[in-house]
Structures are given as structure tokens and as C-alpha cells.
Design a protein with these regions (language model features):
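Non-catalytic substrate/cofactor recognition surfaces at enzyme active-site rims
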Residues: 1-222
Length: 222
């Protein structure tokens, strides 16, 4: 707004970044990687690049608009009977550990919470949306979507440019690629990582189908 005009509209959409973090896990312990100062640094970096791009843009008086949506239902992960038995045995554990990651009490509570939540919501509603402006499309989903899944949508989209907007119209937790379930932070089973393996690929397929129902105008600006 300072650079262009007070009535200049800014829309921020979070791309597919479920497996991206600003945290450098190899850095020294005293390196600050979160908080207002880090947020401002990242924000100014993005804003600076955006201003550079805007000065090079060609603007058009009009462009055709279209929108479509679809509601799908996904299967959540379910702790096994053995995992739940272990969880109930260790849920009261307050044994000190180096981090929450290795805390038995944390994981016990997480698995019990997930099991109870699944009884209330045996299927997870997932709203997908697609909006096109000319030959450019925006596709949204409510997950913390892994980069590779977003890139797959872009590669298969019929539009010249396709942008992903994650955590839109809800939050269904992390949505990893199928091979990411071999291990790691984002795919460790809990209420914030409740997607069954393969759900990410289902979202990709359904999003591409949604985009394919929309007409790409031949003579519209990109």
C-alpha cells in the first residue's frame, strides 16, 4: 500500500508448505528462529520480492472469472488396539524427557484423543475449491499440504498457471505424501496428523478433476 495506493488490495494465500519450516535444526541453540523479529524478516523479504514483480506486470482491463467447489470425505488414521492399550497404560506418565517428541504421556494422550475424535467424526469432510482468473487458477484445500502434492496439481492442471492455497475453509491437519509415512515429524499419528496414507493423493486427483471441469479461455490473459 505504501508503494502503490491506500486502496491497493492485498490477498495472502499460504501455498503448499506442510513440509516447510523456517527452523534450522542444525543451528546453534541460541539462534532465534521464531517470534516477531523473525516474522518481520520473512514478511519483508516476501513483500520486497512482490513489489519487484508488481513493477514488471502488465495489467488488463478485464478477464473471465469462474469458480467451482467439491466436498469430499476422507478416512482418518485409527490407532490399533495394541497402540490404544499401550496408550492407556502410559497416559499418566510424567517421566521427564529431552523433548515432547519422546514423551510417552504426550503420545498416549494423542492416540486416545484421536480414537475418541474418530468415534465422533468417522470421516473427515474436506472442501476443495477452484477459482480461475483468465488462464490462471487457484486451487484450495483445508490441509497442511506437502509441497510435492501441490507441485503434482500444478503439473497436471489444464491452466497455464495454478496456485495452491492450503488451510482454506477448515483445517484437517498435515497431508503428507504417501512415502512420507515411513517416518518423520509431520506424519507421526496424532489429532493434527490424522490423514490416512493416500489421502494426499486423493486430494490431488479430486482437485485436478475439479480444475478440468472449468473452461480455460483461449484468448484470455494469463
Amino acid at each position: 500500500k505504501d508503494e502503490f495506493a491506500d486502496d491497493f488490495g492485498v490477498v495472502f494465500m499460504q501455498g503448499a508448505c506442510g513440509d516447510i519450516t523456517q527452523v534450522d535444526n542444525t543451528a546453534a541453540a541460541d539462534v532465534v528462529m521464531s517470534g516477531p523479529a523473525v516474522g518481520r524478516k520473512i514478511g519483508l523479504s516476501v513483500a520486497g520480492e512482490t513489489v519487484k514483480l508488481l513493477t514488471q506486470m502488465r495489467f488488463h482491463e478485464s478477464a473471465p472469472l469462474a469458480a467451482s467447489r467439491k466436498l469430499i470425505h476422507l478416512k482418518p488414521r485409527q490407532p490399533t488396539d495394541e497402540q490404544l492399550a499401550w496408550a492407556r497404560e502410559h497416559v499418566a506418565s510424567d517421566e521427564p524427557t529431552p523433548s515432547w517428541w519422546s514423551n510417552e504421556g504426550f503420545w498416549s494422550r494423542s492416540w486416545i484423543e484421536l480414537d475418541e475424535h474418530n468415534k465422533i467424526e468417522p470421516e473427515v469432510p474436506c472442501e476443495l475449491q477452484a477459482i480461475s482468473i483468465g488462464r490462471t487458477a487457484y486451487a484450495s484445500n483445508p490441509g497442511e499440504f506437502f509441497c510435492a502434492l501441490g507441485n503434482d496439481i500444478k503439473r497436471r492442471s489444464p491452466f497455464d498457471n495454478t496456485f495452491i492455497a492450503e488451510l482454506a475453509n477448515g483445517c484437517i491437519g498435515y497431508v503428507p505424501t504417501e512415502d512420507a509415512y515411513e517416518g518423520g515429524y509431520e506424519s507421526s499419528m496424532c489429532l493434527s496428523s490424522k490423514m490416512e496414507p493416500g489421502n494426499g493423493e486423493i486430494i490431488v486427483d479430486e482437485t485436478v478433476k475439479l480444475l478440468e471441469t472449468m473452461t480455460v479461455p483461449a484468448d484470455a490473459p494469463v
